[in-house]
Amino acid sequence: MLKTSNLISSLLHNNLKNTSILRNKSIFYYSTNSNNNNNNNNNNNNNNNNNKNINLQNIKGTYDLFPNEQRIHKFIFDVGRGVAERYGFKEISTPIIEPFELFNRSVGESSDIVMKEMFKFKDYSNESSSPPSMICLRPEGTAGVIRAIINQSSTNHLTPAQRYYYQGPMFRYERPQRGRQRQFHQLGVELIGDQHPRSDVEIIDMAMNFIERLGINKSDTLLKINSLGDTDSIKVYNETLKRFYNDNVNKLSPISIKRLERGNSLRILDSKERQDIELNKLAPSIQDSLSIQCKDRFNNVLKGLDCLGISYEIDKSLVRGLDYYRHTIFEIQIIDNNQNNKGQRQQQQQQQGLAILGGGRYDGLANQLGYKYKEILPSIGWASGIERMVLFLDQSKIPNSIRPIGIAITDSSLSENAFKLCSNLRRNGWSSTLSTFNLEDENLSKQLKKFKNNPSFVIILAPSEYSNNTVIIKNMDDTTQSIIPLNEIDNFLENNKVLKN
């Protein structure tokens, strides 16, 4: 690659017209359109005006997480991490960028995600690939975890079963709305290598445990569950549905007519179009297409839920939106039990039936993506969207972030001592901060004013006290003050239940 200075020099020397130069054959481009020197001069003169018109707003469907929002997200992730590790799961992390074909094969080329919601682009980094291969921003986490396992499966035959959890951003080109963004965050779990019905029960139990530990009442949620059966059962049901929808094609929405033409009738059951919802009430039940073995398996899952006292509702229309699901599928939905506040009731009715967590079994997905060590690799998992979960949390019960300890002085001669004390406190595990680095130019009242809404305590260094190796500690909540020896600061903070970082 040419050095930047040589590149610019070459462009200027040759006065290239309408040139677009690819940098590293990747995403970054340098372009110029130099018709004559007058145009260049005009462009230079207009630089200031152009800068005034620059719009650097967030990209639609994305948002910034400031400290309070981070606090809420961190709470959800921390609860999820704690629950996952109590069930023996370990954290895994996969790239945000993945091959497009990974999701085309796993999620399904006829799915809404692949057809309408993927952020995909050409990968020019592989010069041997012609035409360039397609890569994408991941729309969900399961396929990436399976891909990672396949990549290292030559030394790991997944015995015993593997348990992973993950968290991070996902991307879908959807219409942004409350609780749904184009960049969103998920927490998910995957149990890979066990096909016993009790593994389904454990995964669902884990999901319910997660919801409860977030502080969401059981009475406000509904577990919906269904079985799609195995691959043969799904083929039989898909043909049954196809006949039903062909007989009622005039009642389908335009988008579902296209789904029918593509041959995936199951997607119509997942439609949110009003006319499709009405027609789906009359659709054949998948239970009639299940083999005896699939029915027995599903009944064993339900018995396991009964054993653990987990309430559920069998929803025969539940199919989930991804092609890789087999056998058990489930969702945890928010239901409206608030009959007191009319405004809250109206808002909750709009969110009635909104899924805050969903998952299911995806036996054979790994084999579909290249896993060779078992005929069918059994797997099951779930994922929860964090942005949607936030809507239903009682944020007053979420722990506050650690409040730092403030350091202030009454005399400029103590500024170096304050700086050193702040550093020592941090090394001892305390969160601490100065009101300003320019302590010499601020009186005590200005310093305390800056600390008003954050630190729980402020340590004040004053000449008379400091000469006796003591400091003043001010409680910013009740304004009381104490004089404490320097070597007793740690004990004082611990006794007052100040949290370490």
Curated annotation (Swiss-Prot):
GO terms for biological process: histidyl-tRNA aminoacylation. It catalyses: tRNA(His) + L-histidine + ATP = L-histidyl-tRNA(His) + AMP + diphosphate + H(+). One of its GO terms (molecular function) is histidine-tRNA ligase activity. The gene is mhisS. This is Probable histidine--tRNA ligase, mitochondrial. PANTHER family: HISTIDINE--TRNA LIGASE, MITOCHONDRIAL-RELATED, HISTIDYL-TRNA SYNTHETASE. Residues 33-54 have a biased composition (Low complexity). HAMAP family: His_tRNA_synth. Its main location: mitochondrion. One of its GO terms (cellular component) is mitochondrial matrix. It is found in: Mitochondrion matrix. Keywords: Aminoacyl-tRNA synthetase, ATP-binding, Ligase, Mitochondrion, Nucleotide-binding, Protein biosynthesis, Transit peptide. Its EC number is 6.1.1.21.
